[in-house]
UniProtKB/Swiss-Prot annotation:
This is Probable chemoreceptor glutamine deamidase CheD. Keywords: Chemotaxis, Hydrolase. Belongs to the CheD family. Probably deamidates glutamine residues to glutamate on methyl-accepting chemotaxis receptors (MCPs), playing an important role in chemotaxis. It comes from Xanthomonas campestris pv. campestris (strain ATCC 33913 / DSM 3586 / NCPPB 528 / LMG 568 / P 25). The gene is cheD. HAMAP family: CheD. SUPFAM superfamilies: CNF1/YfiH-like putative cysteine hydrolases (SSF64438). Coiled coil: none annotated.
Length: 198
């Protein structure tokens, strides 16, 4: 049975490295699957949380740009607080049990040159750790901070994660892509809502 939720037209392709269908998440996207689809993304200062219920073999990934926003600044999906709620709520709606959910978190590199005081990558990493601790969701693996962008593949049915640290040559490309998304989202209207589960 395959009941993948497709959010914002997540691109799917055949991944030749792992010989499976993969879904490539861009900033602000998330996806929950219960099949052999690999969830993949490329991260600079952004963070991806990979959540899984190991009993149901259901899991998902999100990709957020900033920890939290200010009231009324638009495009809430770019913020970790919103992205985490969307991912957790979707898993719960599909039968995941909150007490079984476990997390693996990645990204938060400090790739934006010149931002040495309270860099966004460090803030994103601190946010995801604190958020998951507050939600009582254990982090069973992490690769956060540092200076290198990463490509992440997550296989929700098995829980396997592969992380490839990208060479410095990719830093400018990843940082430019993240900055472009931030600029586009700052002009986007606020849409949708989120239902919070206690």
């Amino acid at each position: 049975m395959s009941t993948a939720v497709q959010v914002d037209d997540v691109m799917r392709y055949r991944d030749s490295r792992f010989q499976t269908i993969a879904a490539k998440l861009l900033p602000t996207q998330y996806l929950v699957v219960d099949d052999d689809t690999a969830l993949t993304t490329t991260l600079g200062s952004c963070v991806a949380a990979c959540l899984r219920d190991p009993v149901l073999k259901i899991g998902g990934m999100n990709h957020f740009l900033l920890p939290e926003g200010q009231v009324g600044d638009g495009a809430p999906a770019r913020y970790g607080s919103y992205a985490m709620e969307l991912l957790i709520n979707d898993m719960l709606k599909r039968g995941a049990h909150r007490k079984r959910i476990e997390a693996k978190v990645f990204g938060g590199a400090n790739v934006l040159k010149g931002f040495t005081s309270n860099p966004v990558g460090t803030r994103n990493a601190e946010f995801v750790r604190q958020y998951l601790q507050a939600e009582h969701i254990p982090i069973i693996a992490e690769d956060l901070c540092g200076i290198h962008p990463r490509k992440v593949w997550f296989f929700p049915t098995t829980g396997r994660v592969v992380v490839q640290r990208l060479p410095h040559a990719h830093e400018a490309e990843v940082a430019a892509a993240e900055s472009a998304v931030r600029a586009r989202l700052s002009k986007a209207p606020v849409t949708g809502g989120v239902e919070l589960f206690e």
